[in-house]
Design a protein with these regions (language model features):
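SAM-dependent transferase fold signal centered on methyltransferase-like domains
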Residues: 1-332
Length: 332
């Protein structure tokens, strides 16, 4: 009930990202795990890093609270509080705030942003995938103020809807956001972002917008508002290393390599080979290596995407992608 072994991958990544965050500050961090449950994240941060100066773990469930208190007892730096993360009675601000709810993080975001230092990092999980990227359109409008995009792009659109909502919550607090590392994996969305001073209008919009250059979206279909800016900070991502203590070290390492490749091509939405062929009426899809080589030979950047093994991200417009596919198909 209070420990999910399937999320050990994410906790491995948390350890790695926390170390980078502390390295940037050149000091140990003040951390708040807002929905701590058994406190496994806090235990790993305290046990596997030297990045934590002080930690507050809050939990409202009385049964979980007992586990949490026992698990964090060895560390004087850790405080356990029975509090509602939506309305915490906390006076301090934190360098790192983590939200890992069951379902939507939306009710907890205002308090998390309020308690986060300027320049601090907010890490957020959302598991309401049927809302952000599925058929529950009404719930998405109610929770996030956006319409999901019901195409093969739904998962990326869901991630960007979550970021747009985070930008809106931060904006209401007079702050901005800077995404560091954002991804979709299995049944969850995960976002690491930095809280910034406001810097003009955030990159938000509905798709398709005038001049939209990406993969075709069926006529009459609209999605958003969503985040149209980068999903990654390549410099930050390049400093994230697999911790020696990782439970899923090889998987985390391969994932980071894939995200680093993807971060080099900053474009809204990816192409999926089968969808491109279907849209163009091509019977046989070209091999991915030939697609990549053809686009690169024409001067375009191209990279794999973590969102789909048959997907790729490129700075080439749809017209160029379509032209390359037709040429490759004619050569078969």
């Amino acid at each position: 009930m209070f420990y999910n072994p399937a999320m050990s991958f994410t906790r491995d990544l948390d350890v790695a990202v926390l170390r980078v965050a502390a390295g940037e500050k050149r000091r140990r961090l003040q951390v708040w795990e807002a929905l701590a449950a058994s406190g496994i994240r806090s235990v790993r941060w305290l046990n596997e890093t030297d990045a934590v100066a002080g930690l507050v773990a809050t939990e409202l469930n009385p049964e979980a609270l007992g586990y949490l208190q026992r698990n964090l007892r060895p560390w004087d730096r850790a405080r356990v509080l029975c509090q509602d993360a939506r309305h915490p009675e906390l006076s301090e601000r934190f360098d790192w705030v983590d939200l890992d709810p069951y379902g939507t993080p939306a009710p907890f975001l205002p308090a998390a942003v309020e308690r986060l230092e300027l320049g601090g990092i907010l890490s957020v999980t959302a598991t309401d995938t049927a809302v952000l990227a599925g058929p529950e359109r009404k719930s998405c409008l109610q929770r996030y103020g956006a319409r999901p995009l019901r195409t093969y792009l739904c998962r990326e659109a869901g991630l960007r809807i979550l970021l747009a909502h985070l930008a809106s919550v931060a904006g209401q607090a007079g702050r901005g956001i800077h995404p560091l590392l954002c991804y979709v994996r299995d049944h969850h969305f995960r976002v690491y972002l930095r809280l910034t001073a406001p810097g003009g209008t955030p990159p938000l919009g509905e798709v398709p917008f005038p001049g939209y250059p990406g993969p075709p979206i069926p006529e009459g279909l609209r999605g958003g508002p969503l985040w149209t800016g980068p999903l990654f900070d390549p410099d930050f991502l390049g400093r994230v290393e697999v911790p020696a203590s990782a439970e899923q070290g090889p998987s985390v390492g391969a994932w980071l390599s894939l995200l680093q490749e993807e971060s080099a091509v900053d474009r809204l939405f990816y192409y999926e080979v089968g969808e491109v062929c279907s849209g163009l009426g091509l019977a046989q899809p070209p091999r991915r290596e030939r697609i990549f080589a053809s686009l690169r030979d024409a001067g375009w950047a191209v990279a794999r995407t973590h969102l789909d093994p048959a997907g790729f991200r490129t700075d080439a417009p749809w017209s160029a992608v379509a032209g390359r596919f037709r040429e490759l198909s004619a050569l078969r």
